[in-house]
Design a protein with these regions (language model features):
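Single conserved hydrophobic/aromatic residue that forms the stacking wall/gate
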Residues: 1-11
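A gly/proline- and charged-residue-enriched helix-loop-helix capping module
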Residues: 12-34
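ATP-binding/phosphotransfer module of carbohydrate and carboxylate kinases, centering on a glycine-rich
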Residues: 26, 49, 75-217
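A short alpha->loop->secondary-structure connector
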Residues: 18-20, 54-64
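A short, charged helix-loop
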Residues: 62-82
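Short beta-strand scaffold segments in enzyme catalytic cores
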Residues: 36-40, 45-51
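Short, well-ordered, mixed-charge alpha-helical segments that flank or form enzyme active sites
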Residues: 9-12, 45-49, 56
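Short, well-ordered beta-to-alpha junction loops that form the rim of enzyme active sites
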Residues: 1, 41-43, 157-159
Length: 217
């Protein structure tokens, strides 16, 4: 998708970005020669896999947001009984998903911004956002192991920039490395998780996409 493509192309190798545009959430490796993942929960859920081959950037956009295998886990996590409006992953893990979950549980149609800004005072907002981070952590653990993402994981978008300032983000710092297998725990420990601070990330990504296309043609 264009959203996933934009996320992918904006990664660290993007010439319009500097080191100051990144914030480390969890320490680990950032090796350009290894597979990297970019994820951005916003209107939907963008997810791209990034890899350099022979000094040329390859971006693989995905349709992760339309996956369904996590539905049971997420409906239990968010305590949603009526799942009629929760069909795919991005119905839970996106800004739109946060709105839908809040409306389903309260009957109130607040904006994502209103829900996020109520984190400290609204118990339901806190419940949803805390579990949003739990769900994101669980899924990123699986994705990190699936793709062996030794180059790091990168969050993008205004929603993640805001959540990264909340106490809920500590769950990822404390839990991401945990696995029943010590060997796989060590793999997770070596994977860094980073936040892209730069605004309008998909715009920058799509601008760079045309450059990458020309390199391949």
């Amino acid at each position: 998708t264009a959203r996933s493509r934009g996320l992918g192309d904006v990664y660290k190798r993007q010439p319009l970005m500097t080191k100051n545009d990144f914030k480390v959430i969890k320490n680990g490796n950032m090796d350009n020669s290894q597979t990297c993942l970019a994820i951005g929960p916003g209107t939907g859920l963008g997810f791209s896999v990034l890899r350099y081959v022979g000094n040329v950037p390859y971006v693989y956009p995905t349709e992760l947001g339309n996956a369904r295998s996590y539905n049971d886990h997420l409906s239990n996590l968010f305590e949603i009984d009526n799942c009629e409006n929760f069909i795919v992953l991005e119905d839970y893990l996106s800004g739109t998903g946060i709105k839908k979950i809040y409306a389903e549980k309260s009957g109130q149609n607040l904006t994502t911004e209103e829900i996020v800004s109520g984190y400290l005072d609204d118990d339901l907002a806190k419940f949803i956002l805390n579990n949003f981070v739990v769900a994101l952590n669980n899924i990123l653990q699986d994705l990190a192991l699936t793709f062996n993402a030794k180059g790091g994981i990168f969050f993008a978008g205004s929603l993640m920039r805001t959540i990264s300032e909340m106490n809920s983000i500590n769950y990822i710092k404390e839990e991401f490395n945990k696995h029943s297998s010590k060997a796989h725990s060590n793999i997770l420990k070596d994977i860094s998780i980073n936040l892209i601070n730069k605004e309008h990330t998909p715009l920058y990504g799509n601008l760079n996409y045309s450059v990458i296309r020309r390199l391949h043609e």
